[in-house]
Regions:
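Alpha-helix N-capping/helix-start residues
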Residues: 24, 51, 141, 170-173
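Conserved acetyl-CoA pyrophosphate-binding loop and the N-cap/start of the following alpha-helix
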Residues: 134, 138-147
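Conserved beta-strand-loop-alpha-helix junction that forms the acyl-donor binding cleft
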Residues: 131-135, 150, 162-176
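Conserved active-site tyrosine of GNAT-family acetyltransferases
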Residues: 179-180
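Amphipathic alpha-helical recognition patches that constitute DNA-binding helices
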Residues: 29, 125, 129, 142, ...
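GNAT-family acyltransferases
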Residues: 1-133
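Conserved GNAT acetyl-CoA-binding A-motif
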Residues: 123, 154-167
Length: 180
């Protein structure tokens, strides 16, 4: 089964946040929200590796949504599979100061990815990366089921996946409880 040459990444609305297609500009916003602080305890990668992975995932997602083949986009790797990247956006003012909580990052508080999308096996891996001040607030619990619903939904509404899996280091008990 072949994946489409071009993907239209749908916006997804959650109760607390909404998701929009990630852009190249959002890569810099991940630095502003300190998304890579403590990465080794969360994903098992150090800051440099996590930053590199997010950069590659966003670029692959943008390339796919533009209809570029991996060898045309400059981000290709013959062994890499397709990726979809969403930016997680909030419009919350939790402290009641009249300013949006994430105004310094254009309201981006993290990203969620479907990576290693395999059309033949109909499987993908899901990964969430949140800014350090946005962890443990229930955002992952809000958005993960919605992204998985899109992944499992039959085409054309979704990707028609049969399996979506997650890789979490054993010591990250907080994330393990969300993913279960």
């Amino acid at each position: 089964r072949e994946l489409p040459e071009r993907i239209v990444i749908p916006p997804i609305k959650g109760e607390m946040v909404h998701l929009r297609r990630a852009t190249i500009d959002d890569i810099a916003r991940m630095e502003v929200i300190e998304a890579y602080v403590g990465a080794s305890g969360i994903t098992g990668k150090d800051r440099v590796a996590e930053r590199g992975a997010v950069n590659a995932w966003v670029r692959r997602s943008v390339a796919w949504s533009n209809g570029e083949k991996s060898n045309e986009s400059g981000v290709g790797d013959p062994e890499s599979r397709r990726t979809i990247a969403w930016s997680i956006v909030t419009e919350a003012d939790h402290d009641g100061d009249g300013e949006l909580d994430a105004a310094s990052s254009d309201n981006v508080i993290g990203m969620i990815f479907l990576i290693d999308i395999d059309g033949w096996a109909r499987s993908a891996r899901i990964q969430v990366v949140l800014g350090k001040d946005y962890r443990g607030r229930g955002y992952s619990r809000d958005i993960m089921p919605r992204v998985m619903t899109y992944g499992f939904a039959p085409e054309p509404a979704g990707l028609g996946m049969h399996r979506i899996w997650v890789a979490v280091p054993e010591q990250n008990t907080r994330s393990v409880s969300v993913y279960q």
